[in-house]
């Protein structure tokens, strides 16, 4: 150890290793491109090429990494842009104008792409409960999946002569590949949204834990693996299997970087064990022995004058400090060996680190009962996650102002848990729920009660849980949420050549905004295009008899017609950072140019755009 210390203190006679530094820089941007080599870490150049290419890059070089048929397509899918947008649904929202919480309906792959600019490095906690790939619950089939027969050949389950190489390939091969191809791009996009000290928790079971661990190692980096916790999900075992009854599942935890520090948790304390025999003003305490075999050896004097030489837990300086602070207790009227005090109030404040065995959290059966009570004893969801599980995760990994994302939100347990946490510590955590509006089968109770898709139940769960928390605690927190739906772009597609249109169609294209789109639709797309959070406060007011929208202090927009110099002079007094008009808002190009020049003259900091 001494030699190592000397080597660290000694100045290196060589210049710094630029190759290693470059590898470190690349690992921050593309941790999945870091692999093992004979002499340490190296770059997987084929994978790096794929990250930087819009086309599929071929390569067959052997290396240590997880491969499956369709992986390159999955990487390409994560990197490819989307032409979709989000549309606000005010009537379905709660406190739309004031809330900072979001509920987004749509395919989470597209939604994650849309959120990349607005929420880049802003999400502190991600919790997801994705499909476990049991063979029954797979719903996210992306359009980049390769042909099934082609996969059998690529994966070695068939050769070019159509001969089967392993048994039962129809269920064994594509089964895992589809799941991996679904998860990979979503996790890759999710990582971009995490803060530098951000963290992700993923619920999973034995079907894919091995594969999930490998792709998370690749996407987040092996150094950012925090834990694989085991959670008891059943209170009683089911005797449905031939061998061992499974009563657990996993929660895989990764950070974005080494900056992540989890909060300590409140310890379980039996307060009856804490006493205060000497009326210490700091309150009740328990004592622990000061002796420790192999520790520092010295002599102490008890309160009765007895001298004791022992091997102690503390250095003599620490012992004297504890003694001066009246933290040493001598039993048997001062004759016994010293013990140090651990005060109840200090124990509560300090907290403890969590471990990997989570057995004190509610079971899935208890969570089902909890949700049934919320919906007047009606069963709409099978085995939702317990609120106290997600609440524990939120408490463990967030502070009061953080943003929490769940892009497989299901029944919106995460939203419920975030509101619970805020009610306890008066926090202002924000949630973003993303859920595919999966249709509900007509024979189910939920459908008969008027719920046509899962999203409708989820939103109602947030409303009901919010009302319950408010009634139970009277906490002054954000109970609202803005609803957005994934949809096609607000702009008409104009990929055809001009000769492909007739004159009447060309006249319509002068205004390329789809006729069914509202001002709120356009405003939302502008917020996203400019990389602003969807939770910003939106106000409206009139300027020269024209309606103007103001998004915080970041963006002004007016979609009325006949924008002129008079309007420009008045709006310039607001000194907007950005202002947007429709291209058709101006009578002609000269009018548009005049407004732009006038704004530049009267408000030089204003950036003007048209759509």
Short names for language-model regions:
Residues 1-44:
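N-terminal low-complexity, Ser/Thr- and acidic-residue-enriched intrinsically disordered segments
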Residues 35, 39-403, 425, 436-444, ...:
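Class I S-adenosyl-L-methionine
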Residues 104, 203-204, 406, 559-560, ...:
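Small/polar loops that bind or transfer phosphate-bearing groups
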Residues 115-119, 412, 569-571:
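Short amphipathic alpha-helix with an adjacent loop that forms part of the alpha/beta core around
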Residues 128, 402-421, 527:
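A phosphate-binding catalytic loop at a beta-strand-loop-alpha-helix junction
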Residues 210, 214, 356, 388-392, ...:
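Feature representing long, continuous alpha-helical segments
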Residues 227-230, 409, 430-433:
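Beta-strand segments within the central parallel beta-sheet cores of soluble alpha/beta enzyme folds
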Residues 420-611:
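PRPP-dependent phosphoribosyltransferase catalytic core
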């Amino acid at each position: 150890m001494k030699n190592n210390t000397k080597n660290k203190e000694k100045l290196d006679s060589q210049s710094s290793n630029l190759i290693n530094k470059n590898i470190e820089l690349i690992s921050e941007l593309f941790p999945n491109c870091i692999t093992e080599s004979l002499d340490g870490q190296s770059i997987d150049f084929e994978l790096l090429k794929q990250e930087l290419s819009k086309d599929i890059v071929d390569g067959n070089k052997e290396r240590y990494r997880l491969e499956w048929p369709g992986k390159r397509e999955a990487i390409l899918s994560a990197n490819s842009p989307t032409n979709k947008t989000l549309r606000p649904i005010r009537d379905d929202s709660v406190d739309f104008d004031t809330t900072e919480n979001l509920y987004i309906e749509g395919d989470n792959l597209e939604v994650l792409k849309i959120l990349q600019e607005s929420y880049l490095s802003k999400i502190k906690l991600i919790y997801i409960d994705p499909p476990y790939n049991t063979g029954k619950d797979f719903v996210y089939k992306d359009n980049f999946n390769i042909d099934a027969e082609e996969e059998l050949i690529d994966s070695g389950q068939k050769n070019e002569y159509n001969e089967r190489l392993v048994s039962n390939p129809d269920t064994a091969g594509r089964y895992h590949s589809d799941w991996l191809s679904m998860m990979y791009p979503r996790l890759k996009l999710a990582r971009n949204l995490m803060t530098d000290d951000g963290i992700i928790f993923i619920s999973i079971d034995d079907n894919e834990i091995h594969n999930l661990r490998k792709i998370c190692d690749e996407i987040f980096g092996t150094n950012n693996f925090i834990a694989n916790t085991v959670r008891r999900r059943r209170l009683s075992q089911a005797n449905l299997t031939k061998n061992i009854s499974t009563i657990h599942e996993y929660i895989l935890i990764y950070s974005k970087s080494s900056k992540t520090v989890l909060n300590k948790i409140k310890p379980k304390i039996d307060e009856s064990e804490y006493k205060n025999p000497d009326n210490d003003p700091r309150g009740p305490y328990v004592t622990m022995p000061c002796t420790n075999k192999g520790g520092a050896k010295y002599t102490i004097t008890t309160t009765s004058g007895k001298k004791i030489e022992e091997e102690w837990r503390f250095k003599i300086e620490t012992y004297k400090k504890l003694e001066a602070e009246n933290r040493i207790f001598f039993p048997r009227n001062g004759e016994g060996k010293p013990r140090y005090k651990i005060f109840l109030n200090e124990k509560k404040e300090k907290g403890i680190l969590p471990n990997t065995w989570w057995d004190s959290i509610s079971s899935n059966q208890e969570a089902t009962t909890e949700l049934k009570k919320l919906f007047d004893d009606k069963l709409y969801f099978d085995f939702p996650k317990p609120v106290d599980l997600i609440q524990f995760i939120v408490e463990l990994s967030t502070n009061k102002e953080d943003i929490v994302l769940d892009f497989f939100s299901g029944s919106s347990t995460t939203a419920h848990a975030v509101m619970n946490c805020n009610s306890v510590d008066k926090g202002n955590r924000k949630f973003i729920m993303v859920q595919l509006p999966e249709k509900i089968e007509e024979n189910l109770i939920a459908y008969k009660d008027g719920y046509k898709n899962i999203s409708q139940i989820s939103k109602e769960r947030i409303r009901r849980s919010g009302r319950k928390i408010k009634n139970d605690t009277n906490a002054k927190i954000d109970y609202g949420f803005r609803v957005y739906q994934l949809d096609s772009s607000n702009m008409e597609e104009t990929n055809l050549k001009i000769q492909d249109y007739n004159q009447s169609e060309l006249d319509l294209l002068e205004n390329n905004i789809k006729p069914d789109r509202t001002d709120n639709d356009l405003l939302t797309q502008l917020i996203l295009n400019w990389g602003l959070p969807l939770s910003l406060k939106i106000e409206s007011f009139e300027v020269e008899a024209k309606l103007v929208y103001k998004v915080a202090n970041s963006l002004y927009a007016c979609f009325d017609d006949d924008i002129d110099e008079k309007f420009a002079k008045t709006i310039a007094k607001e000194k907007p950072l950005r202002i947007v008009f429709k291209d058709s808002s101006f009578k002609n190009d000269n009018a548009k140019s005049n407004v732009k020049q006038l704004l530049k003259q009267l408000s030089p900091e204003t950036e003007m755009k048209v759509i």
